[in-house]
Amino acid sequence: MTSRPSSDQTWQPIDGRVALIAPASAIATDVLEATLRQLEVHGVDYHLGRHVEARYRYLAGTVEQRLEDLHNAFDMPDITAVWCLRGGYGCGQLLPGLDWGRLQAASPRPLIGFSDISVLLSAFHRHGLPAIHGPVATGLGLSPLSAPREQQERLASLASVSRLLAGIDHELPVQHLGGHKQRVEGALIGGNLTALACMAGTLGGLHAPAGSILVLEDVGEPYYRLERSLWQLLESIDARQLGAICLGSFTDCPRKEVAHSLERIFGEYAAAIEVPLYHHLPSGHGAQNRAWPYGKTAVLEGNRLRW
């Protein structure tokens, strides 16, 4: 059995300010207000993007408004990190308008988020910019989970963002599922399976250097859609050059009457490309969503993922 991740809910001090942006779906006002209150409780100095409360259909503003907030977050000199408030949908729309020279000219500051934000994390990695796959900031403003243990895990996951920024956390537990068990070293990439698969064939296609450790997670998708997305994503990259595939949580993904488990389905694809498969990484849309450094070289060995 794999060990549990650290349940430490202690927030580490964050030097400088954190820029809060909403590059994807719109945010409920009450959730935003609760999030800002909790950031203040944890002593986080923040800058709120000008358009985070904007609405355009189901999005947090127009493409132009969301791009303006993202670029401004990198223009300000005292920003330590850029934390996305919510995922959902919309990040792919921003890619054609991103000024990479402008972003690269800023002092290093990671972009933080998951779910649809995975699209931006991959693009940042492609352009040599730091990123963190981890909870979005509005996780702080959500109503507590009914199960005390799950609420503790959520709070520990949110705190893991500050711990990673402080350079404290350096590993997460995993469990081997199939393929060889040799030591694997490569760049940590991936994120939300559906979001990344949807970008195949576009300028936002997954950046997957040889030897990469591909992390995958998802939420609310039936098995056939997950298999379709997996096939599409693997066909869009040189999948045989991956170092490993590591599964996070697949939350509320109904099996219904499917004969095979999700692990068996993923196992078939991993075996076909001769890539080792791991699972139980505490990453995804469940209560456990520990932060990890996107694009950083990591090592899979035994039941640990270290960076």
UniProtKB/Swiss-Prot annotation:
It is found in: Cytoplasm. It is an enzyme of class 3 (hydrolase). GO terms for cellular component: cytosol. Pathway: Cell wall biogenesis; peptidoglycan recycling. The active site is at S115 (nucleophile), E217 (charge relay system), H285 (charge relay system). InterPro entries: Carboxypeptidase_A_C_sf, Class_I_gatase-like, LdcA_N, Peptidase_S66_N, Peptidase_S66C, S66_fam. Its main location: cytoplasm. The keyword Hydrolase applies. SUPFAM superfamilies: Class I glutamine amidotransferase-like, LD-carboxypeptidase A C-terminal domain-like. Its EC number is 3.4.17.13. GO terms for molecular function: muramoyltetrapeptide carboxypeptidase activity; serine-type peptidase activity. It catalyses: N-acetyl-D-glucosaminyl-N-acetylmuramoyl-L-alanyl-meso-2,6-diaminoheptanedioyl-D-alanine + H2O = N-acetyl-D-glucosaminyl-N-acetylmuramoyl-L-alanyl-meso-2,6-diaminoheptanedioate + D-alanine. GO terms for biological process: cell wall organization; peptidoglycan biosynthetic process; peptidoglycan turnover; proteolysis; regulation of cell shape. Keywords: Carboxypeptidase, Cell shape, Cell wall biogenesis/degradation, Cytoplasm, Hydrolase, Peptidoglycan synthesis, Protease, Serine protease. Changing S115A: Loss of activity. Transmembrane segments: none annotated. Homodimer. Releases the terminal D-alanine residue from the cytoplasmic disaccharide-tetrapeptide GlcNAc-MurNAc-L-Ala-gamma-D-Glu-meso-Dap-D-Ala, which is a murein turnover product. Probably also act on free tetrapetide. May be involved in murein recycling. Belongs to the peptidase S66 family. This is Murein tetrapeptide carboxypeptidase. The lineage of its organism: Bacteria, Pseudomonadati, Pseudomonadota, Gammaproteobacteria, Pseudomonadales.
